């Protein structure tokens, strides 16, 4: 079989991932909920995993790494942390339902930074115009899950920093596939699933949090 649906989930998982999952089910106890040996070992494994994620994505501290159920879970946390009810948000034209549905539930005014597909310069200009509306936040996917378009996230992040507007990045399609330098981008939040480009099991995700 030739598998072409990695935008949904990666399959099959590498042998090392399969072994790690089986070992965890056989030996891991409950992290953070006990002082016995197995619980302490689970704590240590969790800490090492957070540290590895911080190193991989250039996050200053492992304390800025939060594990979630998936990218949707992380995006909901980020959105509800920054967007007030009936607030104003700028988004790209490629956002997933994981972004649009919580914004709808909040009654947010959504301004779409619309630009032609595969047009980085016009995309940047669209975000620059949209920022004039003084939004509560900007939400932008790094890579479109439908078209595969890579958005100029570095330049969009620079615009947001210049306007002092918090940025939420959806890295669902890029984490593990494209380089991500969290420190250089300096977003408020960056969300990703564990089961796509990172080749982890479903039901896992990571939310990287800014220091502010």
What label would you give each PLM region?
Residues 1-212:
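Pyridoxal 5′-phosphate
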